[in-house]
UniProtKB/Swiss-Prot annotation:
It comes from Clavibacter michiganensis subsp. michiganensis (strain NCPPB 382). SUPFAM superfamilies: Carbamate kinase-like (SSF53633). Substrate binds at G76, G77, R98, N199. CDD domains: AAK_NAGK-C. This is Acetylglutamate kinase. Catalyzes the ATP-dependent phosphorylation of N-acetyl-L-glutamate.
Amino acid sequence: MTAITQDAAERDQAQAESKAATLIESLSWLQRFHDRIVVVKFGGNAMVDEELTRTFAEDVVYLRYAGLRPVVVHGGGPQISAMLTRLGIESEFRGGYRVTTPEVLEVVRMVLTGQVSRDVVRGINAHGPLAAAVSGEDAGLFTGRRRGAVVDGVEVDLGLVGDVVAVDPTAVLAQLDAGRIPVVSSIAPDESDPAVSLNVNADAAAAALAVALGAEKLVILTDVAGLYRDWPDRGSLVSDIRSDELRALLPSLESGMIPKMAACLEAVDGGVPKAAIIDGRIPHSMLLEIFTTNGIGTEVVPA
């Protein structure tokens, strides 16, 4: 028999009550999201930090067993840059986009589908045979259209870089219906020549997929706490914002935040009830966003 002091007993009871309160707080959100699709864009530090990658996988598995239908979309910028450096291929950026030659595209495809997707799937499947990799090139999932960029008022060629202009979610829905967690890489065949593929922005791809799937929510992991109205003033963090307010604010945002907030706006405009950017550097931030009343990060809602 193990003796326990009154102070220790009271402390244990307080901790137990706190945990129970947290579980009860999540009840309404479990009801709301039950059997609903949530699209999660995985990126930033969480992709290159082993511990954050592990907790991300735990969160995704938790969503699945809590009755949600999670879909993961990922990029792989840091890994692509590292592989290009290893192969002696120069990385060039124009207007915030990676210039993508046919040689670079082969590296992009190799890293996204052969490295990053497999790593994410492996992390999730450490908890059971749940995840399956799906390339944006598979079964017409994504269709892309080439885009350029404007630098100092001049249109510049980005090579094999594009925007997602059409989504056929059949392959993803098949995985969901089989009880799996789809892990989607952001690469898309060119609409003008399907034999050629394009490097597409993962945030935008996640938004387009969320719309096509009729998702309940889009969550984008970032390396900041959320949207700041006046960066770097940390007192200007926005917890929630309407789509019309965001549309007016978008041109004035810091350049690195624009693609992520534009993706949230695209999702909400397309019928997704809510979209959020959250700090992926915080362990289990995804659970805090989905299953607590106050959430974490910045949430975008329809006007």
